[in-house]
Amino acid sequence: MLKFKYSDFIKAIFLLFISIGVFIISAGLFYEESYHYKKDDYFTHYALTLDEVKDIPVISDNYEFYYYSPDGTQRLTNGVVFYNPMPEHKAELVKYIETLGFKKTKSIPWSYGNINEVWIKGHDEVNLVQDDKNRTINISFIKQ
């Protein structure tokens, strides 16, 4: 006669609950189409931040990362907004962009009162925006 083992049943139920939990957590991670996060949010920082963004020189003590997922025609965008940086530190970001192999294609000084620079490498793009009015420097990497 067939013997039913309670321990095998409990193991199967436990494994089922663990699997459902992992699925819900991983699905929830990518549910949002945009994230704003700090470096100390380790899981989000590790999972969503591009290597180019992880290695950006820090030019201010106050900064936050952002991520926009590719959806439809929107491309993956990941970057950093630096609040109250010293304007002369922008040169560090320019040097970093150049070391990655990006070439400056245009500078738009009239873009809503900001200084907007666009850098291209292949199909990838970097936007560097200096907003003197709000005292921010925004660098974003846009991937194809």
Region spans (language model):
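Non-cytosolic head/periplasmic domains of membrane-anchored proteins
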Residues: 98, 102-144
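N-terminal leader/targeting segments
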Residues: 2-75
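N-terminal start-of-chain detector that recognizes signal peptides
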Residues: 38, 51-56, 91, 110-113, ...
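Intrinsic disorder/low-complexity detector
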Residues: 10, 57, 73, 80, ...
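Mature extracytoplasmic domains of secretory-pathway proteins
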Residues: 56-109
